[in-house]
Amino acid sequence: GVVPSKASFSMHSILVNHFLRGAWYPKGGAGEIAFHTIPVIRKAGGNVLGNAPVQRILLDSQGKACGVSVKKGQGLVNIFAPVIISDAGIFNTYERLLPAEARALPEIQSQLRMATHGEGGFTVFVGLNGSREELGLEPTNYFIYAGDDLDEIMNRYLASSREEAAKNIPLLFVTCPSAKDPTWETRHPGKSTLAIVTFAKYEWFEEWKDKQVSKRGDDYEELKKTFVDTIMQAVFKLYPRIEDRIEYISGGTPLTNQHYIASPRGEIYGIDHNIARLQAEAIATVRAQTAVPNLYLTGQDLCLGGFVGALQGALICGSAVLKRNLYADVARLKKRTQATDSKK
């Protein structure tokens, strides 16, 4: 999520090494992750609530986290627990959900000073009439760049006006989720999907932040459409057969991310995972344990951006809560699994 001059070489090397051997995709789509995780949580005595946004973290008289207050209809419901784990991100957890007296703790202020917001994201989701074979789609992630000097083209883009930026997008990530899913054709015959991601500054859309979603006005919709049109012209060069086969297309700005996933400034990878974030002091300071007893952090902000980064954050957090090295447990599980597989 950062330009090369701000990226950690070691972290990027690990990422490249991973993708050299290919990538994984869940059969049935990303929703299968939640579908199979929720029963495990419930079997252990927990529960998963939908449409219940957390409004604040509750503290007891000693300043210890003891629960959360969630929205239910027009009212609030308090849910109490001995351990509170936040995947809402550092800024949301500390600045939105904690009361002022906890937010002012020196340890929390130190963490906030070390963190900066990641860049906002712009997404395009496309529904297509036609199968993977008909449209020439591939189960491949494409990164499309407008030039070789990634620092220069991205810095120029992010420094430009929103009108200029919308017509000169230097970086696109293009993927075809339906082509990756071996169950897709059975479930949705003759249909396909594309997802495209790029970066966009929150400031370009900030003037509409207080407007209701889907009712932000013609100027907002026109700016969003210009971004989408520019993006799709590049995608048509990659997949020319799709141009007259689009049944659905939707663009999402940083404000879309802010509304649906509560990212403070429309970021998709949490805080900025630049070199400063990966310095020893920052890594030692931003930990799963917080200055508020019984409150823990997990997810991308604790480790790295992306699904695997968030998963690492969960392992780190789980280890802290249980006071047990879950990485050792995973290593032992891998050995047992390999031993079982070798006997088949």
Language-model segment annotations:
Residues 1-44, 51, 259-277:
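Active-site/ligand-binding neighborhood in enzyme catalytic cores
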Residues 1-4, 169-175, 237-304:
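A glycine-rich dinucleotide-binding beta-alpha-beta segment and adjacent secondary-structure elements
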Residues 25, 55-187:
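Mid-domain catalytic core of redox enzymes
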Residues 47, 52-66, 70, 251-264:
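Beta-rich nucleic-acid/ligand-interaction surfaces
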Residues 59, 63, 323-344:
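Active-site-proximal substrate-binding core of FAD-dependent oxidoreductases
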Residues 85, 126, 196, 235, ...:
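Hydrophobic, well-ordered secondary-structure elements that form the walls
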Residues 129-252:
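C-terminal segments that line or cap access tunnels to active or ligand-binding sites in enzymes
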Residues 300-322:
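A conserved FAD-binding loop/helix module that cradles the flavin
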